[in-house]
Amino acid sequence: RDFRNLALTELAHTVCELLDWRRPQGGLKSRECYQFLQSLQQRGWLPWLPTAKPHARRPHQTVVSAESDPQLPCTGDLRQWLPVEVQQITERRERQLFQQYLHRYHYLGYRVPYGAQLRYFIRGGRAPARILGCLLFTSAAWKMAPRDGYIGWDESARSGGLTHIVNNSRFLILPWVHIPNLASHVLSLGAKAVERDWPVHYGAEAVLLETLVDRSHYAGTCYRAANWVALGRTTGRGK
């Protein structure tokens, strides 16, 4: 009640400061705290604040351009397309094209990622290398029973260890690309890229990768070929 005059944003900052809830690089986890407090507010569990009415967020609008139109087929043996590289995306124009590709060609579409994230283009062939697909890595799911059982940690250990787990939330080989064994090769390259880049951007070593495979669409064959381990089924993904 001492903080009843604070706006929700200010309250989130204050809670993070009092609990010393920080990212590995030292910044406060204010966004995560705000989202949590907002969910409590909507349930009426913060009685000193007005009950927030859920409102529909304006969906992210992806502007589609001809740049993401289907291209000439990429076919042949993987050796013909070496070296294949995963190139981190840092420029605005590249981010926009990345969003377009996922929006148009990934069955889940594109959503603005929440929290930590790394984007990569998959490029292959001799110069100029062609874009063959996209990889998106984000912060880990808050709870996932098969994963948590595999690791064997409790609530406290999970809370401290999640910064070392990275989720492969999107993996797209563009529909005009038909190169056998490309997907598993890319997953191996992606794992090395995350191991290199995650500590640079977020100050935490990436020690485990996770993903969810929709069995109604895919069998997860490329993940198994890249030495990923199937842990079981889950009912959903939550932060």
Question: Each PLM stretch: what is its role?
Answer:
Residues 22, 28-67:
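Charged low-complexity interaction tracts in eukaryotic proteins
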Residues 50, 56-90:
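Conserved N-terminal entry element of GNAT/NAT acetyltransferase domains
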Residues 2-10:
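Short capping segments at the starts of secondary-structure elements
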Residues 12, 16:
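The alpha-helix within a helix-turn-helix
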Residues 9, 40-47, 78-85:
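Low-complexity, charged, repeat-rich alpha-helical/coil interaction segments
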Residues 6, 17-39, 85-239:
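Acyl-donor binding region in acyl/amide transferases
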